[in-house]
């Protein structure tokens, strides 16, 4: 039953226009970082270039996370509007459909994050004459993107309206960067900063001081993801989706 639901979701993903557009947006947005890199850095030693490019990993992960949440929320609201969710519920139990959507949102979020990483590294390679790729940070960025996809799915299920869901999904993550400008300690309690910190990113690159945090980013991140999944899951199981 679960396998059939996953296969049906995978077949629908082959023509996922929403994913295509968000992946393109992540790639283009990440390549824009090249405009902020001074041309003189291309002639700097390799060690200097590597040190200066390290903070960009957190920035790229931030871009990817926000857009991953946007993708997952919009993907759900579009499918609900077009009757795809109602059709799937005629074939599978609600919990099976919810599970397949959850896995699909996490995978889609990771794909969006990967596109952002690719665009960013290409931009840095062109602007700085080549920089090493930290494969550990790549895996962490994909995990952050997957987590953000789950967050976006929860927002989409609860809110349902297209525009409102897009706003809630993006601002509930991106607002952490704005809060960090005025109250760095409070920013550690936001989902985005907790995710970045939990997966080892240098949060100082997005304006947050590690000294301001309590060191409990992992339970905070897990708590936020569980809250999003529980809220979305309960709503999905009880609400009419037609």
Annotate each predicted stretch with a short phrase.
Residues 2-14:
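A short amphipathic helical element positioned immediately N-terminal to and/or at the very start
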Residues 17-19, 23-74, 98-163, 169-171, ...:
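Secretory targeting signals
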Residues 74, 78-82:
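Short helix-terminus and kink motifs of transmembrane alpha helices
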Residues 178-197:
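Extracellular/periplasmic helix-loop junction at the C-terminal end of a transmembrane helix
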């Amino acid at each position: 039953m679960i396998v059939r639901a996953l296969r049906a979701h995978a077949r629908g993903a082959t023509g996922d226009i929403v994913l295509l557009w968000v992946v393109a947006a992540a790639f283009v947005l990440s390549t824009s970082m090249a405009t902020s890199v001074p041309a003189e850095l291309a002639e700097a030693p390799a060690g200097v270039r590597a040190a200066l490019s390290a903070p960009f990993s957190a920035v790229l992960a931030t871009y990817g996370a926000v857009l991953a949440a946007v993708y997952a929320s919009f993907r759900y609201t579009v499918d609900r509007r077009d009757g795809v969710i109602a059709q799937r519920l005629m074939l599978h139990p609600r919990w099976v459909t919810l599970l397949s959507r959850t896995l699909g949102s996490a995978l889609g979020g990771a794909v969006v994050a990967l596109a952002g990483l690719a665009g960013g590294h290409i931009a840095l390679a062109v602007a700085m004459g080549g920089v090493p790729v930290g494969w550990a940070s790549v895996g962490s960025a994909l995990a952050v993107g997957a987590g953000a996809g789950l967050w976006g799915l929860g927002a989409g299920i609860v809110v349902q309206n297209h525009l409102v869901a897009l706003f809630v999904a993006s601002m509930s993550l991106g607002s952490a960067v704005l809060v960090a400008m005025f109250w760095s300690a409070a920013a550690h309690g936001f989902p985005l900063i907790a995710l970045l910190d939990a997966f080892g990113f240098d949060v100082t690159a997005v304006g947050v001081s590690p000294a301001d945090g309590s060191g409990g980013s992992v339970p905070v991140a897990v708590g936020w993801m569980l809250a999003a999944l529980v809220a979305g899951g309960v709503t999905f199981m009880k609400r009419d989706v037609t």
